[in-house]
Structures are given as structure tokens and as C-alpha cells.
UniProtKB/Swiss-Prot annotation:
Protein name: ATP phosphoribosyltransferase regulatory subunit
Name of the gene this protein is made from: hisZ
Family statement drawn from the similarity comment of this UniProt entry: Belongs to the class-II aminoacyl-tRNA synthetase family. HisZ subfamily.
Further facts: This function is generally fulfilled by the C-terminal part of HisG, which is missing in some bacteria such as this one.
Assembly information from the UniProt record: Heteromultimer composed of HisG and HisZ subunits.
Species whose genome carries this gene: Burkholderia thailandensis (strain ATCC 700388 / DSM 13276 / CCUG 48851 / CIP 106301 / E264)
Length: 382
């Protein structure tokens, strides 16, 4: 086998793509900071049981596992940073009020999520801890939309769902709850034949409600139809009210209701959301409320957040990251070195052409040159 080959669905990031990713990373983290979010940096690997406190079988299957040569215990390479950030909030920071945290780092998946998906993603996201009200959900959704707009994405559609609907149906029907994971997979995949098979022997009300969920998709008026078709349970009524409120607050994106869009249901506990753009079949960002995740670390707190894959966003973003630069000669000249240093201190990119390599570099738009005029080094257009 050739030594330069990489594993399937793993790829190098070349300079032009890396520059674009880094430009977007800085933009998004700066925007998160403008909202008051503090950055944290969890480790890439942890003890497996710490990484798998939530997320169900899906997260377990996506997590790489290895044996720690120091302790002999099983380690995992993180497949999602959300549980790690919840651990930091619950166990390390231990704050009493609202905490806003953000993060950016690689995650690894044992299997790709789609046909062309990478198994190494650069996950970036934000989380709010300590507030159970819809204000936190609204802020997180707005921050996610801001991030996508900063990346230059247009015509964003925000799909809303609520984990409380399915939880309420399971709470009143033990038979349905017993096959919850299979039902979740059928609903998330809109697999109607499989859903019909799984619900054939359930109670009439539960069967009708579960079979209705894939059809409850569309604009906010779908919520009225949901009230007619779903059982009149207080938990379902509250969930639909929450979705109606959140939908009414979105001003800069199309809003759709999809009561079967249950990605990540295993650890979500309230409103869930996903962002889509034209030409991309899968969600470009997703998130939701997960109030119970911190319980495994000794301190459950209200929490909601979102994340996205920065490499995927960079692939579809129209943002141009080919930066302007100044081309300078290479000379043993103290005045030249001082001029180059001053320009770099001022934030300019200055590329000194090594002897015999005076051509313009492809990765930078050298639109200016540092030239000597009357014994002084000055910048001129090229």
C-alpha cells in the first residue's frame, strides 16, 4: 500500500481551504465572544465512560476506542464535544448562575454520517447553562443564524422540533417506550413502512400519533394540525406552545416545523432545531435543549446549544479568504528588516521573495510591493 494514502473519508486540508477555515473560525469565535461566550478547550480523548454518558447507541458506535497504555483503561476519541462541555460546566466551573461557553476543535467518527462526509470534523459551537426559559433557546438559535450569515450563507431554513412530544407518548405507553430507539430511527429516517411495522401492536392513540409525526411538516400552521392529531396531553401542549413561540421570534430565516426531525433525540429534552441551505441535503448546523446531560457528572443544569462542522461550512461558504499581501525583496539590509517588521506589526502580510523565486505566490494576492525609493523603503501598488 502506498505510504501517502489516507483512510477512507479522511483528508488533508490544503493551504487555500485551511485559510478559509481559519478565517471562518476567527469570525465565528469573535461573534460568540460578542454575545458573552467564554471559550473552553476539552481534551481530544477521555475515559470512554465519560464520553458516553449521553447520546445513546449512536454516539457509542461513532466513537473510536483504544486502550490507555498508562492505566489500562479504555479511552475514547471524542465524536461530539457537547458532553465534554457539559462536564466542564457541571464539575469544573461549578457556577450557580448562567454560564455561556463556546468551543472549537476536531472530532472523529468511526463511520461517516453521509456518502461524502468526512470522519474528521472541525466542530464549533456554543452552549448556555443555567436558564430553563425559552429566552436561552431563542438566543442560541439567533447566534447560530448569525454564525451562518457571517459565513455568507443565504436562504437559510430553520427546522424546529421538540423532544417532549415523543417523550410524552413514550411516558404513557410502556410498549412504545420499550422500542424507543427503533422508533426514533424510523422517525428520523422518515421510514414509514418500518414505522408502521413497529406500531402495529401499539394502542390506537399511540399508534395514530406516532404515524402522524412524519406528516406533521410545514410552516407554523402545522402546529395547529398537530394539536388536532396528537393526544391532548399537557406535555405535548407545552411543547407545541414552545415551538410556536420560538418560530414567531425568527426574523431572518424561513421557519419550518418538522415533528419527526429527531436527530440527537437520545440526549435532547426540549426544543430541537436544524439549519438547512439550498443545494445541501443535510443540516449544516443543529442543536437543542439537553437539560439532563450534566446529571452524569453530578450536577444537572438547564442547557441548550448548537454546533456545526466548520470544514463543511467552509466548503459551501462564498467567503473569500485569499488575503492581500505585500511582496518584499530578500536583502541583508537593516532598514528593509525594520520596514518589514513594522508592516507585520501593523497586521500586514509581508512575503519576502527568496533569491530566484520572485514570482507571485498563488496563495496570496500580492497587490503591493515594498520598494526602495531614495534610500527609504515604501509600499507601492504592483
Amino acid at each position: 500500500m502506498s505510504t501517502w494514502l489516507l483512510p477512507e473519508n479522511i483528508a488533508d486540508v490544503l493551504p487555500s481551504e485551511a485559510r478559509k477555515i481559519e478565517e471562518l473560525r476567527r469570525r465565528l469565535l469573535d461573534r460568540f465572544r460578542s454575545y458573552g461566550y467564554e471559550m473552553v478547550m476539552p481534551p481530544l480523548l477521555e475515559y470512554l465512560e465519560s464520553l458516553l454518558t449521553s447520546g445513546g447507541n449512536e454516539l457509542r458506535l461513532r466513537t473510536f476506542k483504544l486502550v490507555d497504555q498508562v492505566s489500562g483503561r479504555t479511552l475514547g476519541l471524542r465524536a461530539d464535544m457537547t458532553p465534554q462541555v457539559a462536564r466542564i460546566d457541571a464539575h469544573l466551573l461549578n457556577r450557580q448562575g448562567v454560564t455561556r461557553l463556546c468551543y472549537a476543535g476536531p472530532v472523529l467518527h468511526t463511520r461517516p454520517r453521509g456518502l461524502h462526509a468526512s470522519r474528521e470534523q472541525l466542530q464549533i459551537g456554543a452552549e448556555i447553562y443555567g436558564h430553563a426559559g425559552l429566552e436561552a433557546d431563542q438566543e442560541i438559535q439567533q447566534l447560530m443564524l448569525d454564525a451562518l450569515h457571517l459565513a455568507g450563507l443565504k436562504k437559510i431554513r430553520l427546522d424546529l422540533c421538540h423532544a417532549g412530544v415523543l417523550a410524552a407518548l413514550f411516558a404513557r405507553d410502556a410498549a412504545a417506550a420499550g422500542r424507543g430507539e427503533a422508533l426514533y430511527e424510523a422517525l428520523a429516517g422518515k421510514d414509514v413502512p418500518r414505522l408502521n411495522e413497529l406500531t402495529d401492536d401499539l394502542g390506537a392513540d399511540t399508534r395514530a400519533a406516532l404515524r402522524a409525526l412524519p406528516r406533521l411538516y410545514g410552516d407554523a400552521s402545522v402546529l395547529d394540525e398537530a394539536r388536532r392529531q396528537l393526544p391532548a396531553l399537557p406535555e405535548i401542549a407545552r411543547a407545541l406552545d414552545d415551538l410556536a413561540h420560538l418560530a414567531s421570534q425568527v426574523k431572518d430565516a424561513e421557519v419550518a416545523i418538522d415533528l419527526a426531525d429527531l436527530r440527537g433525540y437520545a440526549y435532547h429534552s426540549g426544543a430541537m432545531f436544524a439549519a438547512y441551505v439550498d443545494g445541501v441535503p443535510n443540516a449544516v448546523a443543529h442543536g437543542g435543549r439537553y437539560d439532563h446531560v450534566g446529571q452524569a457528572y453530578g450536577r444537572a443544569r438547564p442547557a441548550t446549544g448548537f454546533s456545526l462542522d466548520l470544514r463543511e461550512i467552509a466548503r459551501i461558504s462564498p467567503v473569500e479568504a485569499r488575503g492581500a499581501a505585500i511582496l518584499a525583496p530578500w536583502k541583508q539590509d537593516d532598514a528593509l528588516r525594520a520596514a518589514v517588521g513594522a508592516l507585520r506589526d501593523a497586521g500586514e502580510v509581508v512575503i519576502q521573495a527568496l533569491p530566484g523565486h520572485d514570482h507571485v505566490l498563488d496563495e496570496f494576492a500580492c497587490d503591493r510591493a515594498l520598494v526602495e525609493r531614495d534610500g527609504a523603503w515604501v509600499v507601492e501598488p504592483r
